[in-house]
């Protein structure tokens, strides 16, 4: 996984899929964020379903949006 400087990585679970490859994610601490799939996951056709555990990368500037960078098997 490529790591961005300053990005915050947290674990969560997918609550609901939304249009345009967006997902509502509930983080471990109870917060809900809106996240999209990273380019590499899209490129390799990794499917994300509701209730999947994922790693989300959040920007320190906007903690309500993120990028899904990993799906646990």
UniProtKB/Swiss-Prot annotation:
The keyword Cytoplasm applies. Belongs to the IF-1 family. One of the essential components for the initiation of protein synthesis. Stabilizes the binding of IF-2 and IF-3 on the 30S subunit to which N-formylmethionyl-tRNA(fMet) subsequently binds. Helps modulate mRNA selection, yielding the 30S pre-initiation complex (PIC). Upon addition of the 50S ribosomal subunit IF-1, IF-2 and IF-3 are released leaving the mature 70S translation initiation complex. It comes from Mycolicibacterium gilvum (strain PYR-GCK). This is Translation initiation factor IF-1. The gene is infA. Residues 1-73 form the S1-like domain. SUPFAM superfamilies: Nucleic acid-binding proteins. Keywords: Cytoplasm, Initiation factor, Protein biosynthesis, RNA-binding, rRNA-binding. NCBIfam families: infA. GO terms for molecular function: ribosome binding; rRNA binding; translation initiation factor activity. It is found in: Cytoplasm. Component of the 30S ribosomal translation pre-initiation complex which assembles on the 30S ribosome in the order IF-2 and IF-3, IF-1 and N-formylmethionyl-tRNA(fMet); mRNA recruitment can occur at any time during PIC assembly. GO terms for cellular component: cytosol. It comes from the Bacteria. PROSITE patterns: S1_IF1_TYPE.
């Amino acid at each position: 996984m490529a790591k961005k400087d300053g990005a915050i990585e947290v674990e969560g679970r997918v609550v609901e899929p939304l249009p345009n490859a967006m997902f509502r994610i509930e983080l471990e601490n109870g917060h809900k964020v809106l996240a999209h799939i990273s380019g590499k996951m899209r490129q390799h056709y990794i499917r994300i379903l509701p209730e999947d555990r994922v790693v989300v990368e959040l920007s320190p500037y906007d903690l309500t949006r993120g990028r899904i960078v990993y799906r646990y098997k």
